[in-house]
């Protein structure tokens, strides 16, 4: 798998945004990705030094539409901790255009 196939998207929640102050970034990753693959992908794409990777599998939630029910997609979430001397990852543009 290539690096851009492993990292799918950043997770933007209150908890993940609070973790960015401590250089902890949260990403949705491919279901088959390992910790080593996630570490190498983040280092390759963003040019930073990764210290630790925590991965969790998130089950799909039960959703209903009338009498029909199904599950949302399951996903795999990776929390990546960067080294203290590493640069921050810019996930958002700082364009303040009106």
Curated annotation (Swiss-Prot):
GO terms for cellular component: ribonucleoprotein complex; ribosome. One of its GO terms (molecular function) is rRNA binding. Keywords: Ribonucleoprotein, Ribosomal protein, RNA-binding, rRNA-binding. Gene3D superfamilies: 3.30.70.330. The gene is rplW. This is Large ribosomal subunit protein uL23. GO terms for biological process: translation. It comes from Limosilactobacillus reuteri (strain DSM 20016) (Lactobacillus reuteri). Part of the 50S ribosomal subunit. Contacts protein L29, and trigger factor when it is bound to the ribosome. The keyword Ribonucleoprotein applies.
């Amino acid at each position: 798998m290539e690096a851009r196939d492993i990292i799918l998207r950043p997770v933007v929640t209150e908890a993940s945004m609070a973790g960015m102050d401590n250089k902890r970034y949260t990403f949705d990753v491919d279901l088959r990705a390992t910790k080593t693959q996630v570490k190498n992908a983040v280092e390759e794409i963003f040019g930073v030094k990764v210290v630790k990777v925590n991965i969790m599998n998130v089950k799909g939630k039960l959703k209903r539409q009338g009498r029909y029910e199904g599950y949302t997609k399951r996903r795999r979430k990776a929390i990546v901790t960067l080294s203290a001397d590493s640069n921050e990852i810019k996930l958002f543009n700082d364009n303040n255009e009106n």
